[in-house]
Amino acid sequence: MEKFTQIEDKPLVPDEVSLFNGKFLDIINYKETEILQVKDKVAILPYFRDEATFLMRLEYLPAYQYKNMDKSNLKRITNYLTVITGAIEDGETPDKTIRRELYEESGLLLNNLYPFEVEGPYFVDKYNTSQIWVCLLELPVNSYRQIKPPTDGSKVEKLSKCIRVSVGDVNSIVNNDLISKYLITKLINRIGQ
């Protein structure tokens, strides 16, 4: 009997291999699966109960444009109606990000003590590490003040704007993404339309 067993010489394969590193996303191969790494996000639908309106973004979205470029009735559309969204920065909580994004994108400053509920986190999809927290934010009159939004200086924010929509028009909204549809449905259920 041999004192030493021969060990098969296999190259070590790391569990994670970086395929692409971008400004907003990375692609990695992990356990033989290509995975998108994107920052976690928040999605917010502010609802002004006393004014019977809610706030949405008419947002410049090149990804939607790219997907629709071969559709004759959609190829000229540059801005799409969505809820307010934003990335959670390092060290931020979802609550803090909601307050920051509301300020940056809409100019809404919430009172510091105003409480709100956040749902989540939910994974965006099966091949993405990003998780999203969602918030249907009911705002009574004295819970906020509104100023001109400072924006974050990005091209998307320069070409986008927030608009107030009457709750009477809630059933006319064309939803372009699942998160917006989810929050609009929550609003419809809340107001009983």
PLM segments and residue spans:
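Short acidic, gly/pro-rich beta-turn/loop elements at beta-sheet edges
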Residues: F54, Y66, Y144-I147
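Acidic, metal-coordinating catalytic segment for phosphate/diphosphate chemistry
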Residues: L12-E51, L61-M69
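Glycine-rich, pocket-lining loop/helix-strand segments that form or immediately flank
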Residues: M56-T85
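Unchanged
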Residues: K41-A43, K75-L178
